[in-house]
Amino acid sequence: MPVAPLASNSSPLSNIECTVPDRRGPDVTTENVDRHYLRMPHSERGMVVGLFGGSFNPPHQGHALVAEIALKRLGLDQLWWMVTPGNPLKSRNQLAPLAERIAESERVAADPRVKVTAFEQTLGTSYTANTLARVKARNPHVHFIWIMGADSLQTFHKWQKWQEIARTFPIAVIDRPGATLSFLSSKMARTFDFARVDEDDARILWKKRAPAWTFIHGPRSGLSSTAIRNGSSHSDAE
């Protein structure tokens, strides 16, 4: 069954700036990574928390924009910026050290509600589905939403247990260059067409029982980690 676009109200986006300011991050070393970043951030009962995971190799203002849109449109109390030790779908050869990616993430994550963390290193989980299951088990009274950029949807069905991910927490898909319309053809969008929530209801997505997902339109940054590593700054693909 084809997935039809949902009507959206663009007025909430008028208060979202396309440029997200930098903040000066701490002096991150291997020692204080162990001390400060390998535990799950503290959260209170009843909080609404976004989970934004990635290799962030390197992190950039496009990632910060996704985080800021998610905070505003979803009404999040916190957003956990989860720097993964590795990515099963990507080569480790070009992966910067974890401490470096954490330090850069702290620099670009401007909002104090963003909690940069690398707790997956401690869990020893290689796949998102396993990580989310552990997060859910340890925080039964917190309302989580999985955050992902729309450019990831085309390969989401290649993730291990991807349908289990969709059934663990509601998902918010944030618009990215080149994905505004193409996301409709993704296997995830077609498989879970029945579970799509109008983006006008994004602030109550946390109340929905998974599977539930929404696509959030908004300002888009063409910045790409791959392009930055290759010496450019923009890419339509990432």
PLM feature segments, named:
Residues P2-E238:
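Nucleotidyltransferase catalytic core that binds NTPs
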